[in-house]
C-alpha cells in the first residue's frame, strides 16, 4: 500500500469520527433560526477569514509587469534586427500578443544574403505568453529578419548571447523597449495558461474594440475580467485580478447565507472557512476564466431567494432575479441555477397559495426573472456591436445588433453540443462527486528535480464529508420533511443533474457551483451537532481544522509553488487518477 493511500484512509476515518455524532433531527423549517443578525463576533470572524484568504489568493497571483507595447505586424511585413556583429545565439524568447499567424525567420551575416532559419507559429495557445524561439538556438548571425504571415501582434523579443540578454537595434523598436520584462523561462506567473488564452485575450479585445475571438460563452464574464486589465494592464496579475477579488467577495455572501440559515456564528465561521480554503475555490478564482463569476452570482441569487421565501419581501425576490440575469450573462450554467430557484419558488407558493397574490407574484417574476435578465443579457453584447461599428443606445434597437446576439446563441448551443474531443483530464459527473479525476492546469518540471503544478479539484475533506452530509440531508428530508435540507438538495441537484444527461466533454471544474451546496449541507449537519451534542466543538472545529490542514498540505499543488517532485507525489497522490 502506498503512503498516499494511508492519508486517504486516515481522512475518511476522521470524517466518520466527526460526523458519527450527528443526531436524528426534529423537522426544521426555513427561517426558524433565531439569532441571524450580524454582530461584532461575526464581523471579527469574517474579517479574519477574508484577510487570510486574500493574502493567500493574491500572493503569487501573477506578474504585475509584462510587455505592454506591441509591434502590430501586417501580413507580409518584415522587421530586421541588427546584433552589431556576427554572434552565436544561446537562444531567444518572444512574447506574443493578439491574433494568430506565423513568422518566417531568416538569418544573414551581411544583411543582403538571407538564409532560412525556420519559423514560429503564433497559434491561439501561444498568445500572451513567453515562447522559446527554438529556430534561433545555436545560430551564428548578425542580422535576423522576421516576416509576418497574418496580422499579428508581437510584444517583446529577448535574444541571449554568451549567457545574457543582448541589446540590439531594430526597425521595430517595440520589440526591444521592455527588455527588463524578459524572463529566464516561461512560468505561469509571467504567461497565460489553460483557458486564459481565450478569456484574457477576449477581455483585451473588448477593451480594444476588436470583435472577440472567444464567443462560446456570454460576454459579461469577460467584461469583468477586462476591468482588472484596465486597472493593472494586460499583465498576468491584471487579467487574474477580478477573479481573485470575486473569490474574496464570495466569502461575506457565504457567511451571511450560513448565518441566516442556521443562526450560529460558530457554524457560519466554520462553513465560510471551509469554503474559502476549498481547493476549487482557491484555484478557480486565481485563473482568468468565467466560472468564478457564475458561482458568485449563484450564491447571491440563492441567498436572496432564501430571504424572500422566509420574509416575503419582494425586493429580495427582485434581487434574486437580477443576480440570475447577471449570472446567465456570464455563463449558461447559471440557467441551471434558475431552474432550482423556480422549484423553490413553486414549492413556496404551493404551501402559501392564494390565487390573487399568486398571480401578482407570477407577473412580478416575469419582470425580474425573464424581462430584466433578458435586458441584462442582451445589453452585455455591447462590445460585439461596438466592434462592428455601432455606437450609442441606438445600437440596441438595430436589427444588426439583434442578429449578432441571436447568431451567437445558435453558435453557443451548437458548439457546446459538439464538444466531444477527448482530453486527458476530462471527467464525468460521477467522478466529480468523489474527487476521482482532477483537471491539471499547469505542470512544469525543472532540472533540479523540482516541479510547479496546480489543478482544479475539491478539498477532499469538503468533497467527501459534504457528500456524506448531502446524503444525510436526503434522509432528513424523507424522514422528517426537513425544509432546510430540501432547499439545499434542490440547489445541489439543479447544478449537478444537467451534467448527468450532457454528453459533451466535461471537467472537474463544472462541479464548482455544486460545491456551494456541499458547504451548506455540511453546515446543516454542523448545526444539528451544535444543538444536540454536548461536546460539539470537537466535531465541528475538528472537521474544520482538518479541512484547513488539507489546504496547507496541498498548497504547493494549488499555488504552483516549486517542490520536490518525488516528495509531492508521495504525499499528494491520494487516489490513482490524481495527477500529482
What are the roles of these predicted feature ranges?
Residues 1-45, 49-81, 164, 177, ...:
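Transmembrane helical bundles and short interhelical boundary loops of multi-pass, membrane-embedded
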Residues 241-262, 300-304, 472:
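Transmembrane-helix motifs of polytopic, lipid-linked glycan transferases
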Residues 301-317, 327, 346-353:
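Membrane-interface transmembrane helices that cradle and orient dolichyl/undecaprenyl
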